[in-house]
Amino acid sequence: FSGYTDIAIGIAMLLGFSLNINFNSPYKALNVSDFWRRWHISLSTWLRDYLYIPMGGNRSGSFFSYFMMFIVILFVSLIAQSWYVPVIFAGFVLVIFLGARFSSTFKRWIDANVNLMLTMVLGGLWHGASLNFIVWGALNGFGLVVYKLFKNISPWGDKSKWYNRTIGLTITL
């Protein structure tokens, strides 16, 4: 990946163009959110501008968000080729539905994070139409959701101390 990126940068320089930075030392990131801000900036920006924000961003889940969640679950169920994957997804959706039905706080939390998860899953699907890449996207989305959940209560939130930066860097890697 780095090789053909370097070739593209070199050819652009030979032609007199200056390309934007696409990777900004992501492995020096102090948290998961910072990692994704630094990693593959052109793709991340495209996913944010043309997928995440039109679906509602972190403010709300739209009809499109939930429709896309259904499509992704259907797609994953079909390519998994096993009976238990749709059953697991059905149970997961039932738990989310019941939680949102009986708790307005949980519903707001789901609405705020469904678009983030969908964007990461679809970003994984963009890398390859296999279950491995979809799971990779889902795990990264889950990491971002967990980070958003715990960043305000984290004892390592103060990045002015060297040991907090070290802990954040270690957890991110």
Predicted segments, located by residue:
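Membrane-embedded transmembrane alpha-helical bundles that form the catalytic cores
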Residues: 1-173
